[in-house]
UniProtKB/Swiss-Prot annotation:
Region (Disordered) residue spans: 185-217
Compartment(s) of residence: Endoplasmic reticulum membrane
TM region positions: 244-264
GO cellular component: endoplasmic reticulum membrane
Protein name: Protein rot1
Keywords: Endoplasmic reticulum, Glycoprotein, Membrane, Signal, Transmembrane, Transmembrane helix
GO biological process: 'de novo' protein folding
Species name: Sclerotinia sclerotiorum (strain ATCC 18683 / 1980 / Ss-1)
UniProt family annotation: Belongs to the ROT1 family.
Annotated GO MF terms: unfolded protein binding
Biased segments, Low complexity type: 188-197
Protein function: Required for normal levels of the cell wall 1,6-beta-glucan. Involved in a protein folding machinery chaperoning proteins acting in various physiological processes including cell wall synthesis and lysis of autophagic bodies.
Glycosylated residues, chain numbering: 51, 136
Keyword Aminoacyl-tRNA synthetase assigned: no
Amino acid sequence: MAPIVLPTVLIASAYLLSTVSAAPNVDELVGTWSTKSAAVLTGPGFYNPVNDSLLEPTHTGISYSFTADGYYEEAYYRAISNPAKPSCVSSIMQWQHGKFVLNDDGSLSLNPFSVDGRQLESAPCTADTATYTRYNQSETLQKYQVYTDPYTKLTRLDLYQFDGTPVNPMFLAYSPALMLPTETLNPTSSAKSTSSSKMKRWLGGADEPEEPTTSEGYLLPLNKNAKHISRGIEQPSLIHRIDLDLLWWAGVGMTIFGGAAYLL
């Protein structure tokens, strides 16, 4: 029986090592990943939190970013075809960020900051205006794979949706990740998602919805309560605080006074 002990120990050790090596490792996720065109990237080039706007990329695509301490950001830009009228292509842009958990089974749980997500829908053939709303959608990714793509020789990330459907492959674009600050950028007094609040931003057209405005008639942004924008919403500019008629007469008086002083 003695000769059997050593092979058994070796087999058990090999199994243990393979199990440890296969354990989920968040470090290999760290960075910014983008689909092949690399036109869509997370960060300030896709969402501008200062003026609360989504910036349209040159091509459609997907981008995800992950940090070692459990934060993520995602950016989607998709075209939606219309088989009945091919020229009427609509588009949708989505942006979210928040925290993620790498589970023991290798799945990923993505939990966004509920008030920060944004979505822009555009259907030029059916609506005169685009619809800009808050967006809040938690995600479960069944698994992921990071490896060197045999064709491009680039570091590749494959994500799989909750049902096993593969997401378009992404490639490492930045390491460390290109991301906006990993905190709530647009705090509100009541954190509700778009599905319940139905809040919209008017982007031009015939029927303007009723929305709160400043004293000068400008629409208040969705992120009006954010630290980086709330300070200046109701502050009038210098030109509104000066009486231009009074300034003109003061100039005339100074000219006359200067001329009289010169003649004396």
